[in-house]
């Protein structure tokens, strides 16, 4: 099992309840595929360095996980097709 840091940006025009549902849904994607979430950080709404899909702001969410590659690949696949996540990145942490 490797350690990963997953960062994703949720669109800014989402209501609070839907935002929590998106976070819960993507945390469940990781845990249902065998990942162990070791930490989460909500950075809140921040200004983007450049415009993405006509958005200038976004809600940043960081999740630290310990998992195999399958869970991270499934997260990546679903984040790409989700309309609520405007950008995401997965970084493998050094041992």
Swiss-Prot record:
Query: What function does the entry list?
Result: Binds together with bS18 to 16S ribosomal RNA.
GO BP annotations of the record are: translation
Q: What does the subunit comment say?
A: Part of the 30S ribosomal subunit.
Q: Which InterPro entries match?
A: Ribosomal_bS6, Ribosomal_bS6_CS, Ribosomal_bS6_sf, Ribosomal_S6_plastid/chlpt, Transl_elong_EF1B/ribsomal_bS6
Native organism: Bacillus subtilis (strain 168)
Single GO MF descriptor = small ribosomal subunit rRNA binding
A GO cellular component annotation in the UniProt record: ribonucleoprotein complex
**Which keywords accompany this UniProt record?**
Ribonucleoprotein, Ribosomal protein, RNA-binding, rRNA-binding
**Family, per the entry?**
Belongs to the bacterial ribosomal protein bS6 family.
What the entry lists under Pfam families is as follows: Ribosomal_S6 (PF01250)
SUPFAM superfamilies, alphabetically?
A: Ribosomal protein S6 (SSF54995)
Q: Report what the protein is called.
A: Small ribosomal subunit protein bS6
Induction cue: Strongly expressed during exponential growth, decreases 2-4-fold in stationary phase, part of the rpsF-ssbA-rpsR operon. The operon is induced by DNA damage by mitomycin C.
Question: What lineage is this protein's organism placed in?
Answer: Bacteria, Bacillati, Bacillota, Bacilli, Bacillales
């Amino acid at each position: 099992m490797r350690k990963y840091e997953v960062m994703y940006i949720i669109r800014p025009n989402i209501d609070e309840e839907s935002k929590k549902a998106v976070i819960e849904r993507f945390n469940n994607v990781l845990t249902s595929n065998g990942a162990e979430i070791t930490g989460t950080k909500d950075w809140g709404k921040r200004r983007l360095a450049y415009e993405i899909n006509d958005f200038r702001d976004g809600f940043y969410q960081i999740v630290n996980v310990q998992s195999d590659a399958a869970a991270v690949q499934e997260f990546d696949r679903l984040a790409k097709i989700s309309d609520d996540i405007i950008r995401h990145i997965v970084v493998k942490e050094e041992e």
